[in-house]
Amino acid sequence: MAPAADSPTLQPAQPSDLNQYRGYDHVHWYVGNAKQAATYYVTRMGFERVAYRGLETGSKAVASHVVRNGNITFILTSPLRSVEQASRFPEDEALLKEIHAHLERHGDGVKDVAFEVDCVESVFSAAVRNGAEVVSDVRTVEDEDGQIKMATIRTYGETTHTLIERSGYRGGFMPGYRMESNADATSKFLPKVVLERIDHCVGNQDWDEMERVCDYYEKILGFHRFWSVDDKDICTEFSALKSIVMASPNDIVKMPINEPAKGKKQSQIEEYVDFYNGAGVQHIALRTNNIIDAITNLKARGTEFIKVPETYYEDMKIRLKRQGLVLDEDFETLKSLDILIDFDENGYLLQLFTKHLMDRPTVFIEIIQRNNFSGFGAGNFRALFEAIEREQALRGTLI
């Protein structure tokens, strides 16, 4: 079973605020080559191209490719011009400089995690009253399909949250983008990957920063502490971490916040902060209703996942028998796919993590299936840490 979660008593959110958050709208990445990055998600992970912004749509300084699988939407944005040329494009000058600076400092990574809300003005004004650092005020973008309201605030590191209100828009994505309808030519040859939505999005912090960041989510966005574990629960022979899951008032949006803890060697959190050059999004968990099909088809498409040792499943079989828990899925199939299992008295969770998506050991993806289980796989953290430490050893960063 998973370690017990720490659930501090907090003041309840105001009833009027409980249903403000509708979920994750999209995740916005800054990357060196958006077209190639989009191709990765299309061919490796079964996403579809849904929208585009670039030279052909009148955007002369930046290009964005939008891909989607289920209700999971990624925007991948790259600069089209050098920093030296930025002054030639006054409308995009600040954005162009920001993207270049982000890529220089962090490499490819997540810039913005956008939330869909019922009323931007309400959530944004409350955040500002409570001390939010404003990146951009409430603004409206529109086209023939209606209008979208949005505003952006800063969170940890250089990451931001954009609040988006879509009630007045009937288009496929967002004004300023051209919709894409042609299926990728490879899709008819590759197995379909069915994903549902973003389950959670994890942020890594530097030493002793977790509590400050969690306090920020509580104060600025009205989030609460949903679940937590400390270094006694999440440790190996060499390293450890602490984690607190922050959730929106209605528990629709969940943002786990990690920080390193003392250990004999450098942990994966320290490695991330070192290579990312600061705090940022470590991984995005994508929910599926059939993880066996999803992992089977992702592997067939060439997605690389961590390897889980045989001993994990020997121990898990004993634990499941002791608990009297019978999985709906075939245990040997889960084992053959390296899928991790965690459970409590109410249900169970199945999960697996990709290897890092970039050469820098920073961002990766989690595939997750929940069966009446609201935790975050704390029972698997040791196995996950050990698997990542084996990768760290190969990179020479387990020091």
From Swiss-Prot:
Outcome of swapping N250S: In strain: IFM 45817
Cross-referenced Pfam families: Glyoxalase
CDD domains in alphabetical order: HPPD_C_like, HPPD_N_like
Any single biological process term in GO: L-phenylalanine catabolic process
Sites where the protein binds Fe cation: H200, H283, E366
Gene3D superfamilies: 2,3-Dihydroxybiphenyl 1,2-Dioxygenase, domain 1
Record has Transport as a keyword: no
Reaction catalyzed: 3-(4-hydroxyphenyl)pyruvate + O2 = homogentisate + CO2
Family affiliation: Belongs to the 4HPPD family.
Protein name: 4-hydroxyphenylpyruvate dioxygenase
Lineage: Eukaryota, Fungi, Dikarya, Ascomycota, Pezizomycotina
Gene that specifies this protein: TCRP
